[in-house]
Amino acid sequence: MNRGTLQQILLITDGQSNKGEDPAAVATMANHSGITVNVIGILDEGRSHSSGLQEVENIAQCGGGMSQIVYKQSLSQTVQMVTKQAMNKTIQGFVSKELSNILGEESDIIDITPEKRAEVMEVVEELEETCNLEVLVLVDTSGRMADKLETVKESLIDLSISLNARTGSNKFSVYRFPGKRKDVEKVYGWSSELKNIAAFFPKLTSGGI
């Protein structure tokens, strides 16, 4: 397989919709364009997982991605885990499609011999390490997220460090919603790393339309 570019949207929210378009419908359109949409819902202490679970799961399902509900102290490791799991899921999907083309539509990774399956998984792991990755981070900056944004910023730095340990190239971009003048506003344009994230921290504040 040729090394390609995986495109992801990472939505970080409190799981309660604001103004604007239906997020599930937008996720569906993105997925149809080949972009995986992952969603992380951040809970307030004392709030049950079930209260924000439905919307978060629905958006991720429509976007063909992964979803997790966490408290803010677990956000950093969850951001990294979800991003990497989504990469693995997408790559396995590509590999399974290639196998179907070669071996027939009924064939899948589980249908081949253990030895061949091990070889296939080696290919998946290699592609995870070498493929190019573009992640557009979409951060909910509604008033309810005010006490979580500092943790979000730290998590994005950790994500950049983690992904840049791979040999494949990475590009990141950060948008916020709701914006002050529009539903969605760009905070940080495409860059290979987020180590200079502090430069746009002042823009990533709660509040908006």
Give residue ranges: language-model regions.
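Short secondary-structure transition/capping segments
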Residues: 50-53, 79-84
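Second-shell loop/turn segments in exported
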Residues: 16, 142, 146-148, 202-207
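Acidic, polar low-complexity linker/tail segments
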Residues: 82-136, 143-148
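Short beta-strand-loop
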Residues: 47-57, 171-203
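Surface-exposed acidic, glycine-flexible loop patches that form ligand/cofactor-binding
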Residues: 1-3, 127-128, 163-166
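VWA/integrin I-like adhesion module and closely mimicked acidic/polar interface patches used
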Residues: 2-6, 13-62, 70
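Short acidic-hydrophobic, aromatic-tinged amphipathic segments that line or gate anion-handling sites
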Residues: 66-75
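Von Willebrand factor
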Residues: 8-12, 131-188
